[in-house]
Amino acid sequence: MNLKNIESTHVLQHDQSDCGVACLLSIIKFHKGDSSLEKLRELSGTTQQGTTLLGLYQVANQLGFIAEGFQTNIRTLAEFEQPSIIHVTLENQLQHYLVCYHYDNEKGFLIGDPAKGVYYLSASELNQVWVSKKCLTLEPNVKFEKSATSKNNKKKWFVDLIKQDYKLLWISVLLGVVIACLGMAMSIFSQKLIDDILPSHKITKLVSGIGLLTILLLARVGISVLREYFLLQQTKDFNNRINNQFFSSLLHLPKSFFDTRKIGELVARLNDTQRIQSVIKLLTSSLVIDVLVSIISLVFLFGYSWKVGLISLLSLPIYFYIIYRSNKKIIQSQTEVMQSYAFNEGNYINTIQGISTIKNDNKQAVFKNLNQTVFGIFQEKIFNLGKINIQLSWQSGLASVFFLIGVLVYTSIQVFNKEIKLGELMAILGIVSSLLPSIANLALISIPINEAKIAFNRMYEFASMEKEPEGGQTIFEIQSITVQDLSFRFAGRKELFKNINLNIERGKLVAIVGESGSGKSTLGQILQRFYSFESGSIKVNNEYELNDIELKSFRNLIGVVPQEINIFNGTVIDNILLGDSVTPETIMEFITQYGFLDYFNQLPQGLGTIVGEEGINLSGGQKQIIALARVLYKQPQFLILDEATSAMDRNTEKFSMELLEKIKPKCAIFFISHRLNTLKNIADEIYVLENKTITHYGNHEQLIQTSNFYSEYWKE
């Protein structure tokens, strides 16, 4: 196997949970295929805890591999001819995945580590961490796609983003050409001043020369300011455009996508737009000027002294190489900084969201130490990057000194030998002094480009993911929902439930009960089309398959009160309307008609009370009342209530139950509850979810006649 090919196709993980899919993506790229971490995360069922070997097996088969799982030994692993994924246990019992490419009799096993890179491990070293002896072999079959389609799509996506900026960017480039040419004015004038003007003692020539130089330098300043303004305008437009497009893509991704992502990482990737724009500005400003300065400087050096020009031309590649050879280390260090930054952001958010638990359990010291560790790792990555930059600075600085001294010594000898004049020496030194920074910038240009490339890939992974479907049959009413032989599992996980059958009709309240974790809420989310089921069918009005209905028209007809209520920054009215424009009379009529007014009048400013992060703290019951008002204002024809009254007091719950009885003739209601005592008088049918399937169903009187989860509650 070609080591360079392996190193070039190896993929580093974006966070700790990515190690499994990063290994799979490395093997895909090794075989000249293409995919993305986000797509593999979704298909494999990767969660914040990571990926199962089953999940990797399932997605590998989907992507055109012959995948086989084994529990084997080191000797057999050494005989594998194709790269395989192995499950290892690192220090502190941390579960991890590695790619084993092949075995070399002298060097050992060639390992691709998504956390560190490519390296060799001896058989004993690998055996020490490979505790489970589990591995997944992967061999591409005829269905495996080898194409550069993804690269073309990335290019098209990026070009579409900057297409509107072409005019401003080209103007900036042309102005950069003028600025680069004017940059030589001082060196040329210095040479003329020393060699011609001052020796001739011609005041008129001196004044006119200084006047011309002043005009050129002022023109350079003016053009630079104008150019910066154009780039500033482009920066604003581009950042708005890419942020809007990326955020819009994010909002239209399937709900399952957000289940496997930390908020801090999503925020960090939204901020990646700044890195991309910085590089665009760099390419259209500094890069253009540096290239032109380098070319023009070399031309002038050859003009003053072809020997000095030749020495510079031969020496600069060495100077360039000294800087360029550090690129790989810098790029790897930059990647680690970005990963640790995202992890640190996530830790902040996670800690702040759990502040009540932390305080109640007196765990401030624990989380303080955790933050210190996470932030310390982040700072350590920044420190390591800084050390590389310092090392690069002194190496390039040393090379610059030797090069400048060499040119100074050689040109001084030329002056002694009267090969060049003193003014020409001064001009040469001035040109060389401006040439070296430009060469250094060109040598380092790949670093910000690769940083932006990493940021771009991180953004494109989200932007290119398959959005929720848009087409389908438009419906205008929901009379019934019929679930037949429904089975479901999360990707890479065991079957959650199987052969579920139930019927929900308008005019009835259908409840489902079962142990925690049995899949009741997941079933509710399947009915919302947040997840795709494995087998079976869900029919609407006994006519349309749920997945064949246009998603927007379906969700316009349903309403949901979830377990976790989201209260947005704004007033109570804002949280009910969610952007709808209505007259005050209309909303007051709704609030009064449904009986919510007394509850909202208890708040400090009534319906105008500011709630959310910037407002008052609401109790769980108050949040549920707002959520109930929000969903009923929508006038749904299919209502899903997931523990919708769990935080309410007795009177508020009684009010909610009476409200459901009132609206029941107009819609079908699916009620998920652990509070079984509330179902006795309100539920028309109750389904019992036990042992991964529906074991019993009927009304209260029917269910208590048999032995089941529901009847056991009433017998206690």
Segments the model singles out, each with a brief description of its role:
Residues 522, 559, 564, 572-575, ...:
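ABC-family ATPase nucleotide-binding domain "signature/switch" substructure
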Residues 528:
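Helix-to-loop junction immediately C-terminal to a conserved catalytic motif
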Residues 548, 555, 573-613, 666:
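ABC ATPase nucleotide-binding domain helical subdomain, centered on the C-loop/LSGGQ "ABC signature"
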Residues 1-186, 199, 203-208, 231, ...:
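Membrane-integrated ABC transporters
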Residues 170-223, 230, 302-307, 419-422:
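Transmembrane helix-loop-helix hairpins at lipid-water interfaces of multipass membrane proteins
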